[in-house]
Amino acid sequence: MNSKLKANGKKEVDALTFAKRLRETANQLGFSKDVLRRAVNEGFSGGEKKRFEVLQMSILKPQLSILDETDSGLDIDALKIVTEGVNNLRSKTSSFLIITHYQRLLDQIAPDYVHVIANGRIVKSGGKSIAEDIELSGYKKFG
């Protein structure tokens, strides 16, 4: 975190301030206190790993986050926590590239733009209605 702050010409934070911010954010995402004592992703379930990614984004506040099939393997409760976390991070200074095969994620994180990739190329771009159409008719027409 301090590397990012320093690179942006901002004041670094001390270890106690960082630890407090980390605990508060972890608590908001439903993590137990013992999670912060583990190494990154050590002994985490699939859902915990996805929630931990949201924790990292909440702390680091990147300008661009790439979420590759972040809904994969999540139960409905974990999906809700992850999508609420992402929605809370949305701002004019942050962008998300969300890669998914399923409408259920896009029902909870409304995309500004949808791009369909087939055979390594973007074959269609537009609004959320593209994803809704794919949910109904599949990917067949995209090759």
Task: Set out the residue ranges of the language-model regions.
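ABC-family P-loop ATPase nucleotide-binding domains
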Residues: 1-62
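Conserved D-loop-proximal element of ABC-family nucleotide-binding domains
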Residues: 75-80, 125
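Helical segment within the ABC ATPase nucleotide-binding domain
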Residues: 79-92
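Conserved H-loop
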Residues: 93-109
